[in-house]
């Protein structure tokens, strides 16, 4: 009888998702899901917050925007912090800061205090998921990276769907304060488990913070995202405030790239883009993030403004996307480990294209099965593309490069989502004005108009949404180019 060689046996063990790896992934998911939920859970409560604090929607929107800005700004610190202090220690500290921000947000006494505490939440939350991904990438190794990334990607795709559902239910049943307090028991459980189960990582005490690169990159990202959000809210590219912010942000990021190429240990190693796997994965994530995550922010507005759905009903209408993603992710992860990202991701992009095409034809009275089926297809496409392409980003990288690669790819994803939201909001605003030339209000006024003129306004608004989704379709199709250049197989 032939005996399996120790080498082959070891290789087989390296491909198996052991209980230790699965437990580690569960802890990371538990901590990460709250931070992603909080990017969307507050959206359904903005009107209530505006009434309670007697302030305008233009002011109260910063409760949502400041979290995103703080979240994106600290991601570049992840690589340095994990190397300087150890990933486990920084993960626990970040979770503790996020929980403190949640507690204080729930106790907020004014709109100013709530915005400040949401910023604290974002600073803590921004590092949790990329740190967890780096820990898992190092523990899993190249033979299991696709399946592990699919597991940890669950909160990224499911939380934005269930966030509005949970938020709407909590606001209706209790109070807006509970959308923040709900994080505390989950966070406490994640903290206790992580303190016991996350592996200790040797800190590199000699690592120094890139003090010159920090304000350039973090400040540039913050200014750029702020400018884009202002373009979306003001509906004008030429307005001085967003224009200066966007151009200033681009200038700071450009200066950072120049600095990083001349520094031994920059905050984000831009030399990673010289690796084909990382560069193509980053480009794929950027295009899909702009198109699909931006679109998924606008779809709830379509349901509420055009079809008159409540916040809770809207959250439930978005569930098919989450189901599609949940079904596709484990299958795509297993296939990626076997045949490589290049064979999986383009197929996922094509499935997403089918769903987006359906929404370009959307009407005010489109049947529910049509909308649900299209969302399910978009979810399948997202589940088969985002995390497999993230796994491909590690191809060709050394063990030591993985933490910095993780922070870079996560920053790209968050920026892409912000960029997509702002750009599609501008397209939507202009499309609405094209359909309704006498309309000069915002999206809230658009909803009131649909209620006042149910015979004509909903159809015109639905047409504006369809026009906007054509823009998303173009970006989704364009993502096929870098997707077809992804690595064929993970290295052995």
Task: Annotate each predicted stretch with a short phrase.
Residues 68, 75-213, 239, 408:
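Helix-loop-helix hairpins in multi-pass membrane proteins, especially solute transporters
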Residues 20-77, 113, 153, 175, ...:
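Transmembrane core module of solute transporters
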Residues 13-16, 22, 143, 191-218, ...:
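Flexible interhelical linker loops that connect adjacent transmembrane helices
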Residues 185-202, 219-230, 248-262, 480-487:
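C-terminal membrane-cytosol helix-exit motif in multi-pass small-molecule transporters
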Residues 49-50, 81-82, 166-174, 228, ...:
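Interfacial helix-cap and linker-helix signal at transmembrane-aqueous boundaries
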Residues 2-32, 258, 277, 391, ...:
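Transmembrane-helix exit segments and adjacent C-terminal regions of multi-pass membrane proteins
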Residues 172-184, 230-242, 310, 430-473:
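A membrane-interface helix-boundary motif in multi-pass transporters
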Residues 77-79, 83-96, 104, 109-113, ...:
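C-terminal module of multi-pass small-molecule transporters
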């Amino acid at each position: 009888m032939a005996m399996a060689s120790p080498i082959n046996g070891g290789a087989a063990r390296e491909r198996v998702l052991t209980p230790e790896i699965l437990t580690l992934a569960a802890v990371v998911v538990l901590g990460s899901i709250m931070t992603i939920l909080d990017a969307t859970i507050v959206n359904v409560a903005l009107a209530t917050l505006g009434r309670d604090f007697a302030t305008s929607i233009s002011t109260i929107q910063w409760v949502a925007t400041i979290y995103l800005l703080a979240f994106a700004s600290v991601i570049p610190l992840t690589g340095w912090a994990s190397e300087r202090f150890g990933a486990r220690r920084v993960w626990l500290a970040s979770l503790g800061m996020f929980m403190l921000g949640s507690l204080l947000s729930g106790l907020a006494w004014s709109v100013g205090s709530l915005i400040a505490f949401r910023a604290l939440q974002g600073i803590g939350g921004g590092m949790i998921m990329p740190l967890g991904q780096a820990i898992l990438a190092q523990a899993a190794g190249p033979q299991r990276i696709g399946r592990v990334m699919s597991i940890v990607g669950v909160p990224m795709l499911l939380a934005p769907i269930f966030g509005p559902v949970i938020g709407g239910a909590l606001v209706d049943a209790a109070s807006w304060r509970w959308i923040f307090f709900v994080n505390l028991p989950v966070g406490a459980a994640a903290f206790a488990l992580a303190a016991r189960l996350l592996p200790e990582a040797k800190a590199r005490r000699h690592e120094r913070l890139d003090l010159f690169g920090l304000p350039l990159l973090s400040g540039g990202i913050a200014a750029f995202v702020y400018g884009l959000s202002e373009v979306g809210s003001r509906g004008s590219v030429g307005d001085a405030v967003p224009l200066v912010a966007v151009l200033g942000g681009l200038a700071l990021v450009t200066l950072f790239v120049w600095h990083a190429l001349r520094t031994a240990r920059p905050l984000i190693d831009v030399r990673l883009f010289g690796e084909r796997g990382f560069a193509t994965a980053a480009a794929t994530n950027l295009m899909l993030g702009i198109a699909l995550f931006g679109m998924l922010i606008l779809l709830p507005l379509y349901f509420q403004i055009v079809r008159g759905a409540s916040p809770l009903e809207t959250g439930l209408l978005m569930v098919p996307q989450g189901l599609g993603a949940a079904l596709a992710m484990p299958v795509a992860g297993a296939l990626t480990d076997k045949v490589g990202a290049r064979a999986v991701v383009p197929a996922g992009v094509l499935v997403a294209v089918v769903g987006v095409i359906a929404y370009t034809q959307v009407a005010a009275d489109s049947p529910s099965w049509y909308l649900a089926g299209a969302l399910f297809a978009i979810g399948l496409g997202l589940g088969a593309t985002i995390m497999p392409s993230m796994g491909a980003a590690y191809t060709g990288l050394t063990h030591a490069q993985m933490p910095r690669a993780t922070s870079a790819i996560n920053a790209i994803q968050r920026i892409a989502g912000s960029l997509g939201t702002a750009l599609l909001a501008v397209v939507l605003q202009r499309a609405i004005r094209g359909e309704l030339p006498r309309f000069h209000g915002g999206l809230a006024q658009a909803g009131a108009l649909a209620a006042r003129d149910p015979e004509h306004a909903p159809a015109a608004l639905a047409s504006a949404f369809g026009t906007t989704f054509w823009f998303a379709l173009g970006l989704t199709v364009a993502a096929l180019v870098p997707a077809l250049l992804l690595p064929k197989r993970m290295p052995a």
